């Protein structure tokens, strides 16, 4: 008798469930998660908090029933940021949680009150929080969960507030970028690759062939896999993705200074005396009396990358990491975040342009010029730069990362990207868009509730 009631209940559930619609105009679906073409409902919102190492950002996206982006207010998304990042509050979890309240207030101005309890709110903490240790990170995340649960009306799931795995971050960036460029739905060779340089880590992601994916090295249990499988606009993609923790822009400064030979740094501009603070620790950043030395600094940077580390596979990038084997999915390469910021601030690309073509060699040429300057001269020459004293170091690191780390030819054309033109709007080429699309999928949310 109980079994009969169970069958009736299941039939009723199926009858009441919205039908899956196969439609080539759907944006994307993750195999085993999002079903392509399933209606998201008119005016569905998603609130995504990007908790990076330097600050926390909120993105509010709105989608139609085909998961195409709709306007939020007068723009295609709402964006706001607070400084510093959650990791700066290590040991002060409540202060960390309270730091996101202004972002929730900002989201409240655009998400209709009647839709808040149906609007998923997700927080992905990236490299900064990974670096402060599990105990302190978990304390902060628990405090954030409590704030979201008790002080907001958004749809709450504790699993949606967590440290973002490196492979997730990289694959979401790849999905967002290729979606915005309308590259999805065709062969993997038509997609673009991406290198994203954050404060604490750098991600490389690009599509590879199924044959290459089959040769991916096994990784120890608990480590992110090298290949993430995605089902996007009717096509299967094997995405090589790796997050190099401790190799972000700010993390690299700390490690370069930590390893300096003697009391002075070969990478700091002449006239600078002081400390660099990263994750609560101070590093002496005093420049040599004669100033920066391009060649000595570059030697230190290449040594940091460990390009000659033992490689257990046929192809490695740096620090003994498999490089994905290369191929057509890496031919058209976009480089984002810190790469774009420094290039636009020193002026070798237009700071008003959302993206621009360049080469790694340009980073080298500017570095050779910058390293000869004093801090005072650099401030005059490059008024838009924020951390003038580190300019030589940063340029050398980014050049070395591209050429020595990822094996690019110095003259290879790359695209420096901040935003992507999609329709009439310019949208951030970042991971929050990828996770937002998944968050508004009814099938994915239903599966998360019942698993």
Curated annotation (Swiss-Prot):
Gene giving rise to this polypeptide: APY3
GO terms for cellular component: extracellular region; membrane
Binding site for ATP: 47-57, 193-203
GO BP annotations listed: nucleoside diphosphate catabolic process
Catalytic activity: a ribonucleoside 5'-triphosphate + 2 H2O = a ribonucleoside 5'-phosphate + 2 phosphate + 2 H(+)
PANTHER family listed in its UniProt record: ADENOSINE/GUANOSINE DIPHOSPHATASE, APYRASE 3-RELATED
Name of the protein: Probable apyrase 3
Subcellular location(s) per record: Secreted
Enzyme Commission code: 3.6.1.5
Protein species of origin: Oryza sativa subsp. japonica
Keywords from the UniProt entry: ATP-binding, Calcium, Glycoprotein, Hydrolase, Nucleotide-binding, Secreted, Signal
Role description: Catalyzes the hydrolysis of phosphoanhydride bonds of nucleoside tri- and di-phosphates.
Family recorded in the similarity comment: Belongs to the GDA1/CD39 NTPase family.
Positions of glycan attachment: 275, 315
Active site: 169 (proton acceptor)
EC class of the enzyme, as a word: hydrolase
Pfam families on file: GDA1_CD39
